[in-house]
């Protein structure tokens, strides 16, 4: 499944040419708009015109966690605050949170990326998708929310918690796809069984899981418990959020199909 087929099926040579063009543009843009990067790139002796191939990325000084914290909250923003329409932040469990600002254009690109990984996982505009990530400063819930809406799916923004009500919505709305952490998806399944809810009442066929690791054993439990096909996706607040990558293992049909 594709959302933007012309991009997702691009020839390798064309993709690398596009990546090089955008790498050079990004370096030049950061140099001109973020004083921190002006200084850092000057010290490294690197500029956009010196980048001749993708392998030259090794000459670009990395941005560290310390850099993000030292420039908290808005020191690395490349656009004026009046253009920011949303701000997200990491949890900051080991220090100051990583703060990310989004322009309208950023949000549009972000939703494109999420729509791509959702489509690659098998989501379509016919799906009813229940989001059981917690909404808030965390990028996961709103990231998947807007990407799935762009794909054309019907989104149920249930959030996390109140599991019994979430199960009621899932059954009554005919939810076909679930966005959650793997552990919460498993907990929901166990709760449904404890409440003696017939699993045949549920129409789940796809799981879009993330925000934590998932062992093969846990994945198997979720797939067998719900009768869905479980996929994982990856993201980080420093790079918008979910949509960076989607992991899909083409191993077998869904357990719902008798695999």
Show the residue positions of the predicted features.
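Short helix-loop-beta connector
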Residues: 123-127
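Phosphate/pyrophosphate-binding loops at sites that engage ATP/ADP/AMP, CoA/4′-phosphopantetheine
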Residues: 192-199
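Single conserved hydrophobic/aromatic residue that forms the stacking wall/gate
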Residues: 250-259
